[in-house]
Design a protein with these regions (language model features):
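Beta-propeller and closely related beta-sheet repeat lectin domains
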Residues: 20-23, 67-70, 127-130
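Short, surface-exposed coil-to-beta transition loops
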Residues: 125-127, 154
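Beta-rich carbohydrate-recognition and catalytic domains
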Residues: 1-63, 73-78, 83-120, 135-137, ...
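A short beta-strand element within beta-rich, extracytoplasmic domains
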Residues: 269-276
Length: 276
C-alpha cells in the first residue's frame, strides 16, 4: 500500500517532520503513522502530508540517544525497534504492544536487545536497519548497516528474523552469509571473474581498527567485565569485487577523483550472465 493516496504521489509539500530517519507505517485499517529519531512518533493525516494531532514520545525500557526507528506489525503485535549507543557498540532493541502503534508498549520477556556485535563473525556495530517481510510465508528479513569502523562504513547486511511462540524476537546473530539472492550461491557454472585479472585506478590503503566491544549488552558484567578488545584489518583490493564474499569490497583511494575498475578475462570468453 502506498504512503500517499493514488494520484498524489508527486505532491510537493513541506516535510511532515523537520527531522531525520522518518519511518512511515500503515496500519491494517489504512491509518498512517510516522516515527523518527529520539523516540518521536505521530499519526498522519488522511492525505499523509502532515501530522494529525500532537506528536508523542514513546517510552522505552532503555534510555539514551536513539535514531533509526522501525515499526511493523505481526500477528496482532506492534513492534517498535530503536537503536542505542554507536560505532562498534551499536545495538538494536525493541518494545511490544498489543494496543496500537502509539500506545501500550512494554519491554518483552527475556532479552530486549536482539541484535548486537558478533566479533566471531567480524560484524561490529549492527545499527540502523529496516524490515522486509512476506506475510504470506511469515518470513521476516532484517537489513542493517555496520558501523564498527565509523559512521561512513555503511556496509549492508541481511539476516532472517525469527520469533518465539509468545511473539518475542529471537536473538539475531549477525553474519556475512546473506539471504535470498545474496545468500551462498548455488551456481554451478564457473565464475569467470575468479580466473581474471583486475585493474583498478587505485586501492584504498588497509585499515586496522582496535576497539572495545560490550559482548553482553543485555546483561553487562560489573566493572566492564564483559567488555573485550578486538582487532581487525580491512583491505580494499580490486579482486574483492569477485571473491563471492558479502563481507569484502573494493574501494578507491580517497584522493582518486575518477575511480574505475577493469576486469580482464585474458581471452575471448562467452559470458552467460553478469551479476552485480
Amino acid at each position: 500500500q502506498g504512503l500517499l493516496p493514488p494520484g498524489e504521489e508527486g505532491t510537493d509539500s513541506p516535510a511532515v517532520v523537520d527531522d531525520i530517519d522518518g519511518e512511515p507505517f500503515i496500519n491494517d485499517d489504512g491509518s498512517g503513522y510516522i516515527f523518527w529519531r529520539r523516540r518521536n512518533a505521530g499519526r498522519l493525516s488522511a492525505d499523509r502530508l502532515h501530522l494529525d494531532g500532537e506528536p508523542v514520545t514513546l517510552a522505552t525500557a532503555r534510555q539514551g540517544y536513539s535514531e533509526g526507528p522501525v515499526m511493523f506489525k505481526r500477528k496482532g503485535i506492534y513492534y517498535y525497534i530503536y537503536t542505542l549507543s554507536g560505532h562498534q557498540n551499536y545495538v538494536n532493541a525493541y518494545m511490544m504492544s498489543r494496543e496500537s502503534p502509539l500506545t501500550g508498549f512494554v519491554k518483552p520477556e527475556g532479552n530486549d536487545i536482539f541484535l548486537f556485535s558478533s566479533p566471531e563473525n567480524q560484524v561490529w556495530g549492527p545499527g540502523h536497519g529496516n524490515m522486509f517481510y512476506d506475510e504470506g510465508t511469515d518470513e521476516y528479513i532484517f537489513l542493517y548497516l555496520e558501523y564498527g569502523d565509523g559512521g561512513t562504513t555503511r556496509q549492508v547486511y541481511a539476516n532472517r528474523m525469527e520469533f518465539n511462540d509468545d511473539g518475542t524476537i529471537k536473538t539475531l546473530i549477525p553474519d556475512m552469509r546473506g539471504v535470498g539472492y545474496l545468500a551462498a550461491s548455488q551456481e554451478t557454472r564457473p565464475n569467470l571473474a575468479l580466473q581474471s585479472h583486475f585493474y583498478a585506478s587505485s586501492e584504498k590503503s588497509p585499515r586496522t581498527s582496535v576497539v572495545n566491544i560490550e559482548t553482553q549488552p543485555n546483561q553487562p558484567l560489573p566493572e566492564k567485565g564483559s567488555v573485550k578488545s578486538y582487532t581487525r584489518t580491512h583491505t580494499y583490493q580490486a579482486t574483492h569485487v569477485a571473491d563471492e564474499s558479502n563481507g569484502t569490497r573494493w574501494m578507491a583511494a580517497d584522493t582518486d577523483s575518477s575511480p574505475f575498475i577493469t576486469v580482464d578475462l585474458k581471452e575471448i570468453r562467452k559470458v552467460g550472465e553478469c551479476q552485480l
